[in-house]
A protein has these predicted regions:
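Glycine-rich beta-alpha loop elements in corrinoid/cobalamin-binding modules
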Residues: 1-95
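Short, functionally important structural connectors and interaction interfaces within domains
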Residues: 44-47, 97, 125, 145
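A generic structural signal for short, non-catalytic loop/turn and secondary-structure boundary residues
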Residues: 76-78, 98, 120-122
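Radical SAM [4Fe-4S] cluster-binding motif and immediate context
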Residues: 103-175
């Protein structure tokens, strides 16, 4: 995921190096930066597809799962929501963009991640209570450019996420 402009050069450089050394690996990039650039990717972003195979824009949990299923199956990328890819030299955009049902998403799973190596005095994990912004009027903010409707996760699901993450990962700090 590339979620800020400061990550673009390093993220695309990493994609370039992986593709150069292992061209058979399918590289997908997601994140809010490319969500804001959907029109640019569609119109003149074809050069990025020299080292990135696809972009997942807007919300990505279900699209990423569908992409993995298609790459393991028949490879029909038209079946993957929120995906931008190049096929036969043409940039394809799978619209309409799908919105996640936040209350159907499971508690995040951080198993296998080296949480003790993160540079923080205490373990801190993310918990999602909502996406988008209910107001969308701040002149300095880029959230409205994501074109995402504000939607929330039920309070009982968020509380369950806190409890589960606290017990499973011995975490008392969340953002």
């Amino acid at each position: 995921s590339i979620t800020s402009v400061e990550q673009i050069i390093s993220g695309l450089t990493l994609a370039y190096l992986v593709k150069k050394n292992r061209p058979e690996i399918h590289i997908t990039i997601g994140g809010s930066v490319f969500t804001k650039l959907v029109d640019r990717l569609e119109q003149d972003g074809s050069h990025l597809f020299n080292f990135v195979d696809s972009f997942i824009v807007h919300e990505g949990e279900t699209p990423l799962l569908r992409l993995v299923e298609q790459l393991r199956g028949d490879g029909d990328l038209r079946k993957v929501p929120n995906l931008i890819y190049r096929q036969d030299g043409e940039v394809m955009v799978n619209r309409p963009f799908a919105k996640e049902e936040l209350n159907s998403l499971p508690t995040p799973d951080f198993d296998g991640l080296p949480l003790d190596l993160y540079l923080s005095p205490d373990r801190v994990l993310p918990v999602m209570g909502s996406r988008g912004c209910y107001w969308e009027k701040c002149a300095f903010c880029s959230i409205p450019f994501d074109h995402m409707e504000f939607h929330v996760r039920y309070a009982e699901n968020v509380v369950n996420d806190f409890k589960t993450l606290q017990e499973k990962y011995n975490c008392n700090h969340f953002f």
